[in-house]
Amino acid sequence: MSHAQADGSAPNRIHPTAVLGEGVELGGGNVIGPYTVIVGPVRIGDGNWIGPHVTIGTPGEDRGGPHPVAWEDAPTGDPALDGHGVVIGSRNRIREYAGVHQGTWRASTLGDDCYLLRGSHIGHDAVVGDHVTLACNVLLGGHTHVWSHANLGMGTVVHQGARIGPGAMVGMGSAVRREVGAFTITVGNPARASGVNLVGLSRRGLDEATVEALTPWVKGKGDLPDDGLPDDLSTLVKAWDARPREEH
């Protein structure tokens, strides 16, 4: 089977027991562990560490959806039969028994520099940004959107279609049924905001005065500060502020 690799890139190290179906495109320098199954259409970037017993690209959990034998058969090219696949960026760490389902109307997407711990799950059509941490046994329902730099604690469950804002910290065992605000600390069942993620803001390089200026916006009681934010953070929070209030 063909597993495309960019010309001149570092070699991929794939355990002989791993199963990669047709339509799986790899960048370079990836490690893929024992008994992992990846079925196309899937596109994976560079320098990812994918541990043992990981599944990527299997069909979304839809009773009426197709369940092709994609580890044996090549994709047909028809999304109605193949699904819309998975796109994974670079430098992610995907630990044992994690899973990513393919999309049903768009590709399920994982960004760069994320850490998916043991048993975490990304449902169909989900979008996960960059530098996201999903602790052990975090479950993301279909169509969820986790923005960059969010950190979801062990055993958190996110309902289908819910959104987690950038830099949010969700405490372990939480049940998220609706939107979680940017840079909030949220915990419980049902999950509710309990404070501001000061640690997350300080790790983004903000001094105390800038954190204080941003806090009313985080709490939903003020506007974004006009200046004082690093360019990358400013771009991120402005995008969150301008997000559509409803998603698919």
Model segments located where?
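Interhelical loop and adjacent transmembrane-helix boundary motif
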Residues: 218-221
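Structural signal for interior beta-strand "rungs" in well-ordered beta-sheet cores
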Residues: 7-192
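Short, amphipathic C-terminal "tail helix"
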Residues: 227-248
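Short, low-complexity, intrinsically disordered N-terminal peptides in bacterial proteins
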Residues: 1-11, 246-248
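Conserved beta-strand-loop-alpha-helix hinge in the C-terminal portion
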Residues: 184-206
